[in-house]
Amino acid sequence: MGKIIGIDLGTTNSCVSVMENGKAKVIENAEGARTTPSIIAYANDGEILVGQSAKRQAVTNPHNTLYAVKRLIGRKFDEEVVQKDIKMVPYKIAKADNGDAWVEVNGNKMSAPQISAEVLKKMKKTAEDYLGETVTEAVITVPAYFNDSQRQATKDAGRIAGLDVKRIINEPTAAALAYGMDKAKGDHTVIVYDLGGGTFDVSVIEIAEVDGEHQFEVLATNGDTFLGGEDFDIRLIDYLVDEFKKESGMNLKGDPLAMQRLKEAAEKAKIELSSSMSTDVNLPYITADATGPKHLNVKISRAKLEALVEDLVQRTIEPCRIALKDAGIDVGSINDVILVGGQTRMPLVQQKVTEFFGKEARKDVNPDEAVAMGAAIQGAVLAGDVKDVLLLDVSPLTLGIETMGGVMTALIEKNTTIPTKKSQVFSTADDNQGAVTIHVLQGERKQAAQNKSLGKFDLAEIPPAPRGVPQIEVTFDIDANGILHVGAKDKATGKEQKITIKANSGLSDEEIQQMIRDAEANADADAKFAELAGARNQGDALVHSTRKMVADAGDKVTAEEKAAIEAAVVALEAAVKGDDKAAIEAKIEELSKVSAPVAQKMYAEQGQPADGAAQQAEPEAKHDDVVDAEFEEVKDQK
């Protein structure tokens, strides 16, 4: 069996590693570099250039040179973040027939996984040249906060590149693996702060030693999938454009060639300012007008760069705070802070991290290489070559289904260790309901409509039965790649439906962050909504059971009793449509009171103790683990 390689498929740069003699080794590419720019170019003669060669010709071929494509992977064209990206890049981002964000080169539309596959092919070839054998299997890393569709799309890219992706693992977790292999004995908790080219992640990871085996358990993860070094570059580019405009009156934003030169210069200046206090951006012949050629020469200090990007660095701190809270630990419990991603070389980033965590970050882990090395270690674990490492990763967001009253019922809570499988039994909302629709949701809010819809599917041919009687078992199964599979089974007939949540639009970074912020800010509102939904469900159940009881009682109910009960039922139905929980509860009590004598007659006749409304409020609740679910009836298409 061949080696399983580890690939860090980055927004800006990619890296490949393999296990040799018990250690992860980063493999140099054909140009002799340990990392490869994640840049793909389509030359006029049809040649596809990848890496450094693509980067070198970007200035003369801006429209056909693709970079930061990872920011589009698994996303819809109409998403706000994609629309923002369109304004920033010189190449064309187009809308695919399925609504995804694709790129267009020379009139040909291509998907983000297709483009990413070119980088993966280069990584595969780099490993094959070094190992002298064909490579078919890989572990590929993704940002911890990548959603289901982004993970699926990354796996697709691997398949397009001719790789069997054995596992998708989170970048911070991979970095912790690379770091933890050489650690001293004993248990310790680490923070992995990963600020790369296009994404930011933070993970709280516990490394425990159990019977000589290193166990890596992710306690919590958080992040922003649209914040990274590219955003820092954009701030610097905008500043340079403004300075040139002040001096010459010309706007470079309409000139793709000039903007490509500026992008290169800004990235170079940003890197230089990590070790120097100031630098010059000098671009002769940047453009020309009727008076002749124009030159750009701007001096930038480290302080100026820090002022331009300070809010971006500050944006990384709140996810750190949330991750610690979710992990249930305080800053004092952290043993080490690991910095991953090239952008963490910036002194301001290091300073803010040190201030927040109260300790200096470790400098002995190469921020550009740690992720690929961790992926190679995980590859060796899967191949059975490394036996003393166990990796326990987590699902970053809560997953559940929509149930009665528009509530999201969670099956898998956020930060649950994966792989995992959870089942819960639900039932029908109407008598003789022949089909149910399972609506799968992802997010942190109590109201179903406030969360992201991942998909719907139907379970049909349910035998006719009163509401609450059928038992529909819904199962959520997250595999080791963090990809979700959902099934629904009618326990009476054994009929089953399953879906894998396919690579649809998934969640945008703004939605994910907003969900968690909203969930915290609106905790009280969510609790009130949950109570109101509970009261509505109780009212609906009482209306249904009371009407059934009156029908069953027949002539044992007097006309006066029937009229009083009907009036109370109508009043409760009206209250249930409103938003006043107290009013619903008052009408429930009223209906319970007027229907109690009839209930007593019925139970007395059957020789059972009468307990009025308490007995008849939910006569069909035969199963404690059955939850009323709001399922839609599906009509057969004739």
UniProtKB/Swiss-Prot annotation:
Please note every region of biased composition (Basic and acidic residues). Answer: 619-638
**Which GO molecular function entries does the Swiss-Prot or TrEMBL record give?**
ATP binding; ATP-dependent protein folding chaperone; unfolded protein binding
Keyword Flavoprotein part of the UniProt annotation: no
Extract the CDD domains matched here: ASKHA_NBD_HSP70_DnaK-like
Residue positions, PTM Phosphothreonine: 199
Question: Region (Disordered) spans which residues?
Answer: 602-638
Q: Which UniProt keywords apply?
A: ATP-binding, Chaperone, Nucleotide-binding, Phosphoprotein, Stress response
For bias type Low complexity, the affected ranges are: 604-618
The cross-references to PANTHER family, in alphabetical order and at most eight, read:
HEAT SHOCK PROTEIN 70KDA
What does the UniProt record say this protein does? Acts as a chaperone.
| Identification of the protein by name | Chaperone protein DnaK
